[in-house]
UniProtKB/Swiss-Prot annotation:
GO terms for molecular function: asparagine-tRNA ligase activity; ATP binding; nucleic acid binding. It is found in: Cytoplasm. It catalyses: tRNA(Asn) + L-asparagine + ATP = L-asparaginyl-tRNA(Asn) + AMP + diphosphate + H(+). Homodimer. Signal peptide: none annotated. PROSITE patterns: AA_TRNA_LIGASE_II (PS50862). Pfam families: tRNA-synt_2, tRNA_anti-codon. It comes from Psychromonas ingrahamii (strain DSM 17664 / CCUG 51855 / 37). HAMAP family: Asn_tRNA_synth (MF_00534). Belongs to the class-II aminoacyl-tRNA synthetase family. This is Asparagine--tRNA ligase. The keyword Cytoplasm applies. Keywords: Aminoacyl-tRNA synthetase, ATP-binding, Cytoplasm, Ligase, Nucleotide-binding, Protein biosynthesis.
Amino acid sequence: MSKTAIVEIFNSKFPIGTEVTVQGWIRTRRDSKAGISFLAIYDGSCFDPIQAVVPAALENYSDEVLNLTAGCSVQVTGELVESPGKGQQFEIQATQVEVLGFVQDPDTYPMSAKRHSIEYMREHAHLRARTNMFGAVTRVRNCLSHAMHNFFYEKGFNWISTPIITGSDAEGAGEMFRVSTLDLENLPRNDTGAIDYKKDFFGKETFLTVSGQLNAETYACALSKVYTFGPTFRAENSHTTRHLAEFWMVEPEIAFADLADAAQLAEDMLKYVFNAVLTERADDMAFFAQRVDKEAITRLEKIVSSEFVRMDYTDAIEILQNCGKEFEFPVAWGVDLQSEHERYLAEVHVGAPVILQNYPKDIKAFYMKLNADGKTVAAMDVLAPGIGEIIGGSQREEDLVALDKRFDEMGINKEDYSWYRDLRKYGTVPHAGFGLGFERLVSYVTGVQNIRDVIAFPRAPGSADF
C-alpha cells in the first residue's frame, strides 16, 4: 500500500472517503470515556499534525494504542473524513494502527509533550528537530535554500563548488582553522625551528575556508555569472548570538559588473527568497509570528514591497552624529559601524533596508576596489530593519598594480596569492559580488534570535557535540 505525506492530505489531493496510510510520530494522545483515542500524528512534511480517530475495537488497542506516548512512531491506515473539530479540515478514521517504535521510557524522553526552553533543546540537538519549533525552522531553511538556487538559476548563474580546504585567507584576518595530519607530539621543524609544513599532507599550510569568494572570482572571469553556496569556517572566539564557527555562505560573483550591479542583485535576491517563504511556508511563518516574533510576516512583506535606499558611508556618519541619539559606541569617520548604528539607519532614519556604500579603505579587505578619492573603496553592506547588516559585498579590484599596492599596505605576501593575481594579468574585467551568511538570513526570517538555533548542529567555541 502506498504511503501518503500528511501535507498532501492538507493540500486536498485526496477526496473524502479515500483510504490513506500515513507514517509518522505521535505528538499527543488523548483518550475519551467512549472508548476512542485521538492521535495527533506528524511526519515533518508540514507544520500541523493530522488527527487519527482510533476505536477501541482495534485488536491492539489495549496493549499498544493506549501505551502510545509522544515520540512513538506509527503507521496508520484509515478512511479520510471531514473533521467535526475546530481548527482541522480532515481526520483519519483509523482501521489499523501499527506501532513501529515505542519510546522506551516516556518519563525520561527529552522531547516529551511539555514545552521546553530553547537552551534545553540546544543541549539535545539530536532530538530537537522533533519539536514544532525546529521542524518549522528546518522547513523554512529548506525553502530559503531552494529559492536561493532557483533565483540564481533563473538569472543564468552557474553554481560553483569551491574548496573547503584552502591555502589562502580570503578575508586577510587570520581567523582560520588549520588542517594538518602532523603528529602534534612530534612536529617536524625546519632550520629556523619553525614547523615544517612541507612535511604535512598537502606540502604546505592549509586551512578550512573562510570564504569561497576568491575561488568564485576565477570562474566568474570565465563564465560571467557564478555563485557558491557552501560551508565556511571562522576561528573567532566569539560567544554572541550572531556568530558560529561553522556556517553556510551564499556568494555570487558577476563579471563586467560594478558595485551598483552587485547592490541590485542583492536587493532582487532578498525580495525573491522572502516572497518564496511567505508563499510556500505560510503555516510555519504563522507559527513564528504567533510564538516567536509577531513581526515575522509583516517584516518580510514590507521588505518585499520596499525600495532599498542607497546611502554613502560618509553621509551615514553625518546622519548618526547629528541625530541627537547617544550611542554606546561613538561614531566617527573611519570606524566600522556597530549593529546599533546600522539598525538606527535602517529602522529609524529610513524605515526600510539600506545599502550602505563606499567605506573607508582601512576598515575593508584587500580585494575591494579603490575609489577615485583614494580614501574609500567600492564596498557595500545591506542593512535590514531588525538586524542590521545581512549582506556584505564590493566591487573587486581588477587592476593588478592597485591590488599589489593594497597587498603591500596590508603586509600581505602577494606571492601567496599568485593565482589570484593571474586574473588581473590575463584579460582582467570589472567584477563584483557579495556574501550572505545563510544562518543569519534564516534567523532574520524566522525571528529566532540565536543563530545556533537555525542550524542543525551548531559549532561554536567550546561546543562541537554530536
